[in-house]
């Protein structure tokens, strides 16, 4: 798992995309070339937090295991231990699911 081999710094998080369904509710199969990348993911690892104006570290609102929604163009795609992941700032996260 990426969290043991990579620790993001400051207010960054490592996210694993949650794959979308390959078939629509009506039964139409969507080929990989037509699929959009999912904007939902699971947090794998979190940084220690950002510093406020006084220099105090402010912890993140998210934690490893949270399911999140993020912007379409959020994050930087990386490959860690052979797994495709995203690294993004906490500000790129729109919300926590559940």
From Swiss-Prot:
| Record keywords, A-Z | Chaperone, Cytoplasm
Instruction: Specify the domain of life of the species encoding this protein.
Output: Bacteria
The record's annotation in CDD domains points to: cpn10
Checking PROSITE patterns in the record gives:
CHAPERONINS_CPN10
Localization, per the record, is: Cytoplasm
The record, for SUPFAM superfamilies, names:
GroES-like (SSF50129)
Mind listing the GO biological process terms from this record?
A: chaperone cofactor-dependent protein refolding
User: Which InterPro entries does the annotation name?
Assistant: Chaperonin_GroES, Chaperonin_GroES_sf, Chaprnonin_Cpn10_CS, GroES-like_sf
Q: What is its main location?
A: cytoplasm
Q: Does the keyword Cytoplasm apply?
A: yes
One GO CC term, this protein:
cytoplasm
> Which Gene3D superfamilies does the record cross-reference, listed alphabetically?
GroES chaperonin
Q: Name one Pfam family in it.
A: Cpn10
GO molecular function, one example? protein folding chaperone
Q: Which HAMAP family match?
A: CH10
As for family, the record states: Belongs to the GroES chaperonin family.
Its function?
A: Together with the chaperonin GroEL, plays an essential role in assisting protein folding. The GroEL-GroES system forms a nano-cage that allows encapsulation of the non-native substrate proteins and provides a physical environment optimized to promote and accelerate protein folding. GroES binds to the apical surface of the GroEL ring, thereby capping the opening of the GroEL channel.
Description of how the protein assembles with itself and partners = Heptamer of 7 subunits arranged in a ring. Interacts with the chaperonin GroEL.
State the name under which the record lists this protein. Answer: Co-chaperonin GroES
Q: Which gene encodes it?
A: groES
